[in-house]
């Protein structure tokens, strides 16, 4: 139709079209499209920054952008400025959202595959123009970053910066590595296509890479660190990896030095060797990956605690009074026993594993000296039969501990059968997280621990504890004697005698306490409630080398009891009838009797045994042979044992715990 108009587009000039073609065009001439005029119109601008027209490469991508985008933000005041144009270009071409990207922004962007693909697809003139803009805004390391990007190393920008940290920062204080640094820097410069990478540029790159690394989730950060290790190797700079506070290999190198230091100390427990251990530990803890494996980290810390302990307590006490030995165990040696258990699991680093093995053997040797001293003093205590004011026997615990507290507050008296002091130390931390804080009724006279009966077996020691007298017995006897205890009855209300619950009274896997137990704890007139929990002792009797329960959740139904006691505003007294030792390659000494760690007083007494006799020895004729060493057992292998005279078995914790708001 005559009203229709046809628009033809061409990239040819008028002189190339010929007069016959021009004759057919409107006004007989070629109408030139002015790109910047189109761009201005789309931004509703009347003027523009003159600097923009000096970048001819911009026209094509900007025309495409304004043609494809349905709406554009109008230029403020009708003036199209450089920032607006760069924001559109970088966002649409590279997925870079900032018009003036910093070095950190560029490194963050380089972690996106989409952005790097977009860069690779740009025409060369656009790469040069954008590259110049990036150099202008990315600081001292800008030229090197753009050079690496142009050389196709964009996905490695963060990892290269980690390498720069070693080349330009960490190695600066190690002149012996100067030759390695010089050659490796040359290889890096060639790889990223730059003539010279100066110290200032390298350090700036390193700083921003570390900042970006700190923002990444652990898995992505590890990828960058692994890649940095590969680059170090390709630049023949492996010798520098040990200087890094970030590379996985450098942590292993530091841990290897820690393992070597532990090994030296295990062979010769000297203060100088301990200093080396602590220095190696400090170096390891300074590494950014130190906390990435909490379980391993805790085992390494335990190894260093053991190292400190064996140096400080290598020799037994000069004055071997039982009261002092009991307190020394509860305050010091029990921490050593707790820490050395963590060494059994070892470590995947063979040098660390060897150091732990040697340290564990040394700890056992040191502990044996203390155990022999303790057992000798315990032997004298049992023989005398007299109660000592500064030594609390389990048979006196109700009278000297529970009754005084119950006179002032309703009490839940918990007996965790078989709980050693080291296990209690772990449990106490869990209790504190739940708001149960250890207190002392009287800081001067409150006992840190009590001494079990001999043999340190449930039938003797628990019955004596819950009866308030030296005797053997089962649950029925304990229940009756507990209710009849004169000291407890004196602080109880009429018609509400002390009440004791055993395993049969407690829930198994069911939810909630049995009604009788719950009602007793909730009853404000029931002054004393006792509960025996067998979870720990039950684990000891198993043949599998399973972990001893040491948390509230693992010791069922402790959590339910604590929650009920908290609601009833009861004070908590926590103790045990005896402790235990773990199965750690004990020597089996054949015996016709069933007990694991005691035998009748017949036959010769071995150097690692003691003949104990006296009123606190609850066996025929009040005589028995027990080992003072933790290396001997008389029965089949189990998870743990008790019955002997080591402090691990004979010293039990005594703790008064109050709610944090009390």
Q: Residue spans of the language-model regions?
A:
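…; additionally, a secondary subgroup of soluble metalloenzymes is captured
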Residues: 1-411, 418-572, 576-662
């Amino acid at each position: 139709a005559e009203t229709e108009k046809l628009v033809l587009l061409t990239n040819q000039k008028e002189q190339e079209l010929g007069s016959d073609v021009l004759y057919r065009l409107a006004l007989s001439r070629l109408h030139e499209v002015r790109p910047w005029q189109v761009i201005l119109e789309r931004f509703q601008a009347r003027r523009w920054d003159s600097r923009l027209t000096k970048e001819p490469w911009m026209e094509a991508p900007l025309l495409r952008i304004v043609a494809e985008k349905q709406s554009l933000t109008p230029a403020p005041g009708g003036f199209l400025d450089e920032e607006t144009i760069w924001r559109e270009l970088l966002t649409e071409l590279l997925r870079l959202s900032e018009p003036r990207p910093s070095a950190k922004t560029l490194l963050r962007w380089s972690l996106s595959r989409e952005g790097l693909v977009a860069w690779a697809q740009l025409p060369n003139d656009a790469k040069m123009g954008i590259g110049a803009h990036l150099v202008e805004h990315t600081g001292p390391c800008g030229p090197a970053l753009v050079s690496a990007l142009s050389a196709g190393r964009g996905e490695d920008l963060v990892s290269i910066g980690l390498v720069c940290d070693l080349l330009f920062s960490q190695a600066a204080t190690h002149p012996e590595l100067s030759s390695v640094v010089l050659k490796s820097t040359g290889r890096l410069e060639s790889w990223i296509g730059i003539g010279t990478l100066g110290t200032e540029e390298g350090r700036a790159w390193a700083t921003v890479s570390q900042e970006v690394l700190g923002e990444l989730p652990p898995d992505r950060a590890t990828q960058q660190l692994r890649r940095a290790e590969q680059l170090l190797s390709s630049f023949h700079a492996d010798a520098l990896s040990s200087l890094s506070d970030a590379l996985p290999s450098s942590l292993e190198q530091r841990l290897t030095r820690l393992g070597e230091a532990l090994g030296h100390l295990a062979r010769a427990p000297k203060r100088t060797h301990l200093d080396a251990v602590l220095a190696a530990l400090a170096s390891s803890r300074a590494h950014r990956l130190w906390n990435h494996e909490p379980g391993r980290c805790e085992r390494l810390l335990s190894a260093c605690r053991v190292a400190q302990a064996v140096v400080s307590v290598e020799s037994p006490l000069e004055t071997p009074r039982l009261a002092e030995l009991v307190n020394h165990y509860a305050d010091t040696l029990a921490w050593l026993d707790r820490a050395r258990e963590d060494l059994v699991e070892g470590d995947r680093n063979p040098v660390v594993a060897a150091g732990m093995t040697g340290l564990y053997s040394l700890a056992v040797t040191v502990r044996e000296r203390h155990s022999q001293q303790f057992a000798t003093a315990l032997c004298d205590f049992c023989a005398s039969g007299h109660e000592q004011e500064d030594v609390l026997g389990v048979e006196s615990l109700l009278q000297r501990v529970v009754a005084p507290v119950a006179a002032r507050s309703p009490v839940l008296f918990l007996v965790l059968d078989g709980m050693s002091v080291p296990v209690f130390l772990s449990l106490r931390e869990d209790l504190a997280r739940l708001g149960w804080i250890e207190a002392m009724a009287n800081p001067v006279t409150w006992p840190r621990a009590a001494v079990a009966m001999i043999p340190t077996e449930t039938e003797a020691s628990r019955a004596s504890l819950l009866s308030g007298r030296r005797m053997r017995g089962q649950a029925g006897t304990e229940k009756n004697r507990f209710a009849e205890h004169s000291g407890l009855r004196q602080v109880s209300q009429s018609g509400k005698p002390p009440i004791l619950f055993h395993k049969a009274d407690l829930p198994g896997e069911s939810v909630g306490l049995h009604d009788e137990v719950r009602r007793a704890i909730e009853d404000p007139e029931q002054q004393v409630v006792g509960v025996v929990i067998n979870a720990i002792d039950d684990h000891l009797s198993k043949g599998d080398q399973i972990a001893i329960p040491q948390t509230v959740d693992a010791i069922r139904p402790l959590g339910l009891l604590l929650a009920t006691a908290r609601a009833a505003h009861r004070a908590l007294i926590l103790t045990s009838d005896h402790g235990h030792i773990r199965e750690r390659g004990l020597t089996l000494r054949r015996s016709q009797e069933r007990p694991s760690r005691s035998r009748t007083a017949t036959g010769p007494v071995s150097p690692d045994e003691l003949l104990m006799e006296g009123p606190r020895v609850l066996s025929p004729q009040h005589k028995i042979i027990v080992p003072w060493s933790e290396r001997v057992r008389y029965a089949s292998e189990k998870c743990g044992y008790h019955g002997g005279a080591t402090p691990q078995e004979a010293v039990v914790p005594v703790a008064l715990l109050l709610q944090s708001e009390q």
